[in-house]
Amino acid sequence: MVSKSLFLAAAVNLAGVLAQAPRPSLNGNEVISGVLEGKVDTFKGIPFADPPLNDLRFKHPQPFTGSYQGLKANDFSPACMQLDPGNSLTLLDKALGLAKVIPEEFRGPLYDMAKGTVSMNEDCLYLNVFRPAGTKPDAKLPVMVWIYGGAFVYGSSAAYPGNSYVKESINMGQPVVFVSINYRTGPFGFLGGDAITAEGNTNAGLHDQRKGLEWVSDNIANFGGDPDKVMIFGESAGAMSVAHQLIAYGGDNTYNGKKLFHSAILQSGGPLPYHDSSSVGPDISYNRFAQYAGCDTSASANDTLECLRSKSSSVLHDAQNSYDLKDLFGLLPQFLGFGPRPDGNIIPDAAYELFRSGRYAKVPYISGNQEDEGTAFAPVALNATTTPHVKKWLQYIFYDASEASIDRVLSLYPQTLSVGSPFRTGILNALTPQFKRVAAILSDMLFQSPRRVMLSATKDVNRWTYLSTHLHNLVPFLGTFHGNELIFQFNVNIGPANSYLRYFISFANHHDPNVGTNLLQWDQYTDEGKEMLEIHMTDNVMRTDDYRIEGISNFETDVNLYG
């Protein structure tokens, strides 16, 4: 039998916890409650749009029309419907034996981030707020808004809790509010083809992000954040999303007469040189999705779209997971099956052209890459073991390219093992005779060239760039691989964690990564000096952004190789 004194002690303790639970108000008098997690107040699963269900499936998000009163913002919401990320991990496992090549302390966090920790549901347009415990509404703290990656086919804000950023910002004396936003991916968020284009509902996932930013503008002051000091940042598809938010509506990032964001960080991603939303690539993706869902693709485009809207979530989830991974990561034109595309609306023109013509939001930014971005993707081309195989693969990706353009790529990226990726490893790490070559091509095509396009086109804003090499010679076959930096930002506080957290927190506060970090001075990028920070495991150095000039420039300038 539980004693009366123990019961009273437990009751007093519970009352203390409840008394500490943060309780901000929204819409004037609608009170929500969060959870105190050590030094951090957390508010998880706050709706920012109406559920995109039934007739709203595949459509742009609508403003939230419900009430927040009494919302217990204790738990993350479900993730949006998506590809099972375990499939891609299985592919990498088969190709590389991840358990053997990735250090144990990294493997668990990497798998957790990829697989996610929450269920899936079409009712998924929620966001999360993390702030220093006890922050008052008038604190006006800088706001860091995180947009997750996942190749535009998977991802969830639940995989990226903001506690580490908020705690480090407190330690630095530069406190921030951290916000993470869910958005629809795959066909639910980036369905292309004639029908969805004609309907005017392309790039729904980008609109989800925008709607989340509008919510931040309207409401973050209630949590102690400053709507006039918002930084957007993300990794991989999240960074690509940031790039497309910069060029959205031709660079108009205003809402109700005020800027939605004031600075940006792009980690391993930039503008995508895609064809428009009704071109061959999205049309193939649309038709395959419809076929896998049991819809008649020989019917009218509108009838097929209505068929897709009539299907259950589980049927569409199965359809999305019916794609061969090679369809999504390598054998659909222009590499990615889903993602932001020019539509004459939110993306009014080709992404590169928007940057080069000055039609982008004029805010300071940081953009950087991991040294070996392509190694995690190269297994999709494991069967390409000869130069003719690689040529055929490139011809399918760049379906508009001339044979001369393809041959030039092959000449700039030869089979020579010592120049492939993982870079600077000589003849080692050659999983197949063409693996390092394909990895180098993918690294520069998808990640390095978009970064340099942005840097060269944005001379009228302050910008910084970096290259991370901290896993060099530590992870066989992968090197400093795509996505590894997330482990250091959200899971493991070792090695380069301080560099990412401190530089980025300083940037959110001051639009300068160098204030109060106790780290190496990071010089701004200039066209003349091409200054670049190189992030190591325990220290950093300044270097010049001058590697693989000819190969990367070719991807920037050959119009046959981009949209």
UniProtKB/Swiss-Prot annotation:
Q: Name one GO cellular component term.
A: extracellular region
Q: Which residues are glycosylated?
A: N302, N383
What is one GO biological process annotated to this record?
lipid catabolic process
PROSITE patterns reported in the protein's UniProt record = CARBOXYLESTERASE_B_1, CARBOXYLESTERASE_B_2
Q: Where is this chain's protein located in or outside the cell? A: Secreted
E.C. code? 3.1.1.3
Q: Which top-level enzyme class is recorded in the Swiss-Prot or TrEMBL entry?
A: hydrolase
Q: Which Pfam families does the record associate with it?
A: COesterase
Q: Which residues form the signal peptide?
A: 1-19
Where in the sequence is Pyrrolidone carboxylic acid found? Q20
Grouped into one coarse class, the protein's main location is secreted
Where in the chain are disulfide-linked cysteines found?
A: C80-C124, C295-C307
UniProt keyword terms in alphabetical order: Disulfide bond, Glycoprotein, Hydrolase, Lipid degradation, Lipid metabolism, Pyrrolidone carboxylic acid, Secreted, Signal
An example Gene Ontology molecular-function term: triacylglycerol lipase activity
- The active site of this protein is located at S236, E373, H482
Catalytic reaction list: a triacylglycerol + H2O = a diacylglycerol + a fatty acid + H(+)
Q: What does this protein do?
A: Hydrolyzes all ester bonds in triglyceride and displays a high affinity for triolein. For unsaturated substrates having long fatty acyl chains (C18:2 cis-9, cis-12 and C18:3 cis-9, cis-12, cis-15) GCL I shows higher specific activity than GCL II, whereas GCL II shows higher specific activity against saturated substrates having short fatty acid chains (C8, C10, C12 and C14).
Subunit architecture: Monomer.
Member of which family? Belongs to the type-B carboxylesterase/lipase family.
Q: What is the designated name of this protein? A: Lipase 2
Q: What is the organism of origin for this protein? A: Geotrichum candidum (Oospora lactis)
